[in-house]
Amino acid sequence: MSFDTLDYLSPDAFEVRISELLVATSEGADALIDPSVSEVLRLVKDHLKMDVVFVSEFVDGRRVFRRVETRPGAAVIAEGGSSSLEEGFCQRVVDGRMPRLVHDVEALPNKAELPPTDFPIGAHMSTPIVLTDGRVYGTFCCFSFSANETLTERDLKKLEMCAQLAARKIDAQRAREFEQASANWRLV
């Protein structure tokens, strides 16, 4: 099944492709987050009809956008960009101050406590990326500019599965980097 011919309306096709990517290995990838995660972002964006999908890493009190996919004309964040953790929704999801699935951000009872954004956020879904050692790497997030009442708990489960894929890929890359550094250290 190729990326171009995938029927995004079919939940089964989406889940099958994510499962394929979960078991795939990235031989020799030199980026911390390998290309299969970018493909997953595109799948999520199209399948859930979101405007923006990204993987963020939490670094020194900041949220760094490591991979980003957007619909045409929706490039409101960029790979490599960052902001304070308190300026976004990610940290709030991780620590439980905000639900993982929000159909309409404007309708949240605690909307006044949320940080202002430079662009509208209607529907929002986010889940932590938890590494094998238990540390939270960051989050796997997506949002649309408009509210979306059609999102379901099953959609959130799909996002959680994608976060597991990202965690697996990050863990594998870190293990390769550690192995390489250890080999270099022994050679010196």
Protein language model features and the residues they cover:
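Short regulatory/linker helices and ligand/cofactor-binding micro-motifs at input modules
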Residues: S2, Y8, R17-P35, R186-V188
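Regulatory loop-to-helix N-cap segments in sensory/regulatory domains
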Residues: S2-Y8, S144-M161, I170-E177
